């Protein structure tokens, strides 16, 4: 006798979802949260460049200069510019033969 004949296989009627008739609020809340999560994930994947670019560059502002004398502001600008100038020296030109 084969083991396959003794294995109980579910009938087609048992494969259906049994939670369709359920009025449990937890099931409804989980379904709503799942659908919202899916929608947000799709939007994130579609617009991630716009969203994260906005966060990275759009929301960045320099430190507040309110109440700071103009001479100190100019000194700060010069330091920032010199830092940028130093970074420009790190680029390496590679020429292929």
Curated annotation (Swiss-Prot):
Virion surface topological domain residue ranges: 1-22
Bilayer topology term: Single-pass type III membrane protein
Positions annotated with a glycan in the UniProt record: 20
Subcellular location: Virion membrane; Host apical cell membrane
Site label Seems to be involved in pH gating, positions: 41
Site (described: Essential for channel activity, possibly by being protonated during channel activation, and by forming the channel gate and the selective filter): 37
Membrane spanning residue stretches: 23-43
An MF annotation (GO) of this entry: monoatomic ion channel activity
Lipidation (S-palmitoyl cysteine): 50
Entry remark concerning the domains of this protein: Cytoplasmic tail plays an important role in virion assembly and morphogenesis.
Family membership noted in the UniProt record: Belongs to the influenza viruses matrix protein M2 family.
Name listed for the protein in its UniProt record: Matrix protein 2
Organism: Influenza A virus (strain A/Swine/Wisconsin/1/1961 H1N1)
